A protein has these predicted regions:
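DUTPase catalytic domain/fold
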Residues: 1-144
């Protein structure tokens, strides 16, 4: 599958796959200079890219495992969604969960993009739902 990508600035870096079987494509910070993220704060990190995700798909913006586990940096909304009809700049709302200031450098990998198919659904309002063994059991109801 091809995804059309427009560089909004010459300094932008196209998404890159870290290995042959990686589902995620690295997104890079397109910042002119180092950007600091204070503890427990969020910064919008530009990528310098706009995309044309094919109809029937969306781009999921996920944390990079190393940034999350070693630096305490993750997307503020846990998973960002780039819809197929969005044509603006892709940005990463990066949150610092740590207790120290973190620095984002120009060209640094800040998140990963996974292009995912989805189904369009129609919601029908009903009076009752079918019974199941689980029923209304919620959080933790299926055991550890």
């Amino acid at each position: 599958m091809k995804v059309n990508v427009k560089k909004l600035r010459d300094t932008a870096i196209l998404p890159e796959q870290g290995s042959a079987f990686a589902a995620g494509y690295d997104l890079f910070a397109d910042v002119a200079e180092a950007l600091e993220i204070e503890p427990h704060k969020t910064a919008m990190i530009p990528t310098g890219l706009a995309m044309e995700i094919p109809e029937g798909y969306f781009g999921g913006i996920f944390a990079r495992s190393g940034l999350a586990s070693k630096e305490g940096l993750r997307p503020a909304n846990c998973v960002g969604v780039v819809d197929a009809d969005y044509r603006g700049e892709v940005k990463v709302a990066l949150h610092n969960d740590g207790e120290v200031v973190r620095t984002i450098l120009p060209g640094q990998k800040v998140a990963q993009l996974v292009v995912v198919p989805f189904l369009s659904v129609e919601f029908d309002e009903v009076e009752t739902l079918s019974d199941t063994v689980r029923g209304v059991g919620g959080f933790g109801s299926t055991g550890k």
